[in-house]
C-alpha cells in the first residue's frame, strides 16, 4: 500500500516565507535552475549557503550575487582558488569537503536544503539534513538508492520532510499526496527513451559520449544524460519510488513517452489514470518543492494542449536497455545490491565519458558487480560508504584490464 516516506510540513508552512535556503550543488544543472527560480521570487527566499564543488569560477559569481554567509567547496585547492575571486569586503565562512556540505545542511538558521549534488557525493549532506529536521528538496536520487532505509528512519526521528525534485517523482507526489493510500494500484514513471530510443545492440555498441549526452528533450548534466541514454536513470527512479512511496517493484511501472509532456501517472484501483503534464523544464518541479504547497510562475511558456500534437507511449526495450531490469533485481536483492548498482554505474559512466570503455560495457560491468555481491546488508552510514568505496575500487580495477 502507498505510504509516503515522511510526514509533510505543518499547515503553517504554506505561509512561512521568506524560506531560508542551503543549496548543495549550486553550480550544477539543478542548482543553477534553482537560483533562476529564486531570482524570479526574491521576496520568498533567502539564500544562506551555497556549495559548489570544484567549479569555483561559477561559485564565486553566485556568491557575489547572493552574498550567502556560508560557502562549501570540494577541497583545499578549490578554497584557495575561490578566496581571491571574492570581494575584499565579503567574508563568508568557507567549508571544505564532505564535512563542509554536512555543515551547510545542518545550519540552524536554514529551514530548507536543496540536495542537488550528483551521485553518491550527495549522501552525507542529505543524511545531515535528515538528522537535523530540515525540509529536504531532494534532487539526488542516488541518496535513496544508497540509503533509503536509513534516510527514512532519520526523517521519522527528526521530523525532516522530503519533497521530490525529480520531474517524474514530483509529478507522482502531486498526484498522490492528498489521496487515500488504499486507492493506489500502480505508479507509472515515464521515460523519454533518451537519444537512442529504438536503437539496437549493433548501433549501441559504437555510440560515443558526444552522442550519449545529446538528450532530445531535457537539458541536464553529463552524468545524468548518460544515465538517460542507458535508461538506468529509470532503474534508479524505480528504487527511489520504492522508498518514497512504499510500493514494491511490481507496482512501479515504466512507459516510454518520447515527447516528455506527461511526466508520470498514477493508476488507481478502478483502473483510472491521473497524469501530470507540462513543459520539460526543471524549474517547475524545483519551484514546486521550494515553495510547496504553493505554485510559482517561473517564466515557463503556457502548456497549450491544442499545440502539442500527438502523445505516444510504448513499452521499453529491455533487451537493448538491460539496466532497467538490473535495477529491479537490485531492489529485490536489498540494500547492498543497490549500493553496488549505483557505485558500478558511476564508475562505468565516468570511464565511458573518458572513452575507456564502450557504451554497452556499462550494463556489463554493473551486472558483473551484482553477480559478485556477497555482502551483508549495511545498516550504518559508515558501512554503506565502505561498500560504495569497495565497489568503486573493484570496478576501476576491472576497467584497467579491460
Swiss-Prot record:
Q: Which GO terms describe its biological process?
A: isopentenyl diphosphate biosynthetic process, methylerythritol 4-phosphate pathway involved in terpenoid biosynthetic process
Name the Pfam families for this protein: DXP_redisom_C, DXP_reductoisom, DXPR_C
Pathway the protein contributes to: Isoprenoid biosynthesis; isopentenyl diphosphate biosynthesis via DXP pathway; isopentenyl diphosphate from 1-deoxy-D-xylulose 5-phosphate: step 1/6
InterPro entries per record: DXP_reductoisomerase, DXP_reductoisomerase_C, DXP_reductoisomerase_N, DXPR_C, DXPR_C_sf, NAD(P)-bd_dom_sf
Q: What is its EC number?
A: 1.1.1.267
> Which residues bind Mn(2+) per the record?
166, 168, 237
Cofactors, names only:
Mg(2+); Mn(2+)
Residues bound to NADPH are 27-30, 53-55, 140, 142, 221
Q: Where does 1-deoxy-D-xylulose 5-phosphate bind?
A: 141, 167-168, 192, 215, 228, 233-234, 237
Question: Which domain of life, per UniProt?
Answer: Bacteria
Report keywords, A-Z.
Isoprene biosynthesis, Manganese, Metal-binding, NADP, Oxidoreductase
Show the catalytic activity.
Answer: 2-C-methyl-D-erythritol 4-phosphate + NADP(+) = 1-deoxy-D-xylulose 5-phosphate + NADPH + H(+)
Gene3D superfamilies to which the protein is assigned, alphabetical: 1.10.1740.10, NAD(P)-binding Rossmann-like Domain (3.40.50.720)
Mention one GO molecular function.
Answer: NADPH binding
What role does it play? Answer: Catalyzes the NADPH-dependent rearrangement and reduction of 1-deoxy-D-xylulose-5-phosphate (DXP) to 2-C-methyl-D-erythritol 4-phosphate (MEP).
NCBIfam families from the entry? Dxr (TIGR00243)
What's the family?
Belongs to the DXR family.
Return the protein name. 1-deoxy-D-xylulose 5-phosphate reductoisomerase
Organism this protein belongs to = Lawsonia intracellularis (strain PHE/MN1-00)
